[in-house]
């Protein structure tokens, strides 16, 4: 893989990690387009590190607070919200990944993701701020995050949807969703590094790794800041229409040699 392909995949990862359209699903598509297959596993890991850097930079004040106050309510909310994804991920990760490596399943997953995004906008706007979030809210939002074990189900999309259903206001829904993404991204990095050290990934140039990581970090930061502002006043339906269109296109492409 050359550095330009890594740069493009970094853009895809950075933008789609925080827009509710599934980064993993888009990376699967990117692999097929570039014919990368498992050769891109190590790069995938570095791309996740890039998006993790984006979250750390954007939320630097919050993470400094968490380090200084490890037993704060915010820390406990993040722990509670992470539990469902940890349990589901450890028990069923390989199973769900194996059944989701075909264009048919990825296409249907995009369609399902679009349904949740569309339905979320039918809810009345909530008024809960960060201080109003309960542990029950965090657990329910985290349970929706666990659904993103399916590659084309958007993690940020599901958590934002759940947060809106739990009556968080729109800005807080995105804000908490992206904070909650941190342990999920860390977990994904750890699991991917295990696969890398087990020899499941081919070598890739250091230039491509650096370019891909920095690209993911830069565009990830842009996506986080833009999405929080966008959701204040705009609908999620545009993302629902996008993933519906993408899902239908992928299903139609089953009649070609793309998948």
UniProtKB/Swiss-Prot annotation:
GO BP annotations listed: cell wall organization; peptidoglycan biosynthetic process; peptidoglycan metabolic process; regulation of cell shape; response to antibiotic
Pfam family, one: BacA
Record-stated family: Belongs to the UppP family.
One GO CC term, this protein: plasma membrane
The keyword DNA repair is annotated on this UniProt entry: no
Compartments, record wording: Cell membrane
Topology of this chain in the membrane: Multi-pass membrane protein
Record bears the keyword Ribonucleoprotein: no
PANTHER family per record: UNDECAPRENYL-DIPHOSPHATASE (PTHR30622:SF4)
Chemical reaction(s) catalysed: di-trans,octa-cis-undecaprenyl diphosphate + H2O = di-trans,octa-cis-undecaprenyl phosphate + phosphate + H(+)
Further information: Bacitracin is thought to be involved in the inhibition of peptidoglycan synthesis by sequestering undecaprenyl diphosphate, thereby reducing the pool of lipid carrier available.
GO molecular function, one term: undecaprenyl-diphosphatase activity
Role this protein plays: Catalyzes the dephosphorylation of undecaprenyl diphosphate (UPP). Confers resistance to bacitracin.
Protein name stated in the entry: Undecaprenyl-diphosphatase 3
UniProt keyword terms in alphabetical order: Antibiotic resistance, Cell membrane, Cell shape, Cell wall biogenesis/degradation, Hydrolase, Membrane, Peptidoglycan synthesis, Transmembrane, Transmembrane helix
InterPro entries, sorted: UppP
Class of the enzyme per the UniProt entry, highest EC level: hydrolase
Enzyme nomenclature, EC number: 3.6.1.27
Transmembrane segments: 1-21, 39-59, 71-91, 99-119, 133-153, 174-194, 208-228, 239-259
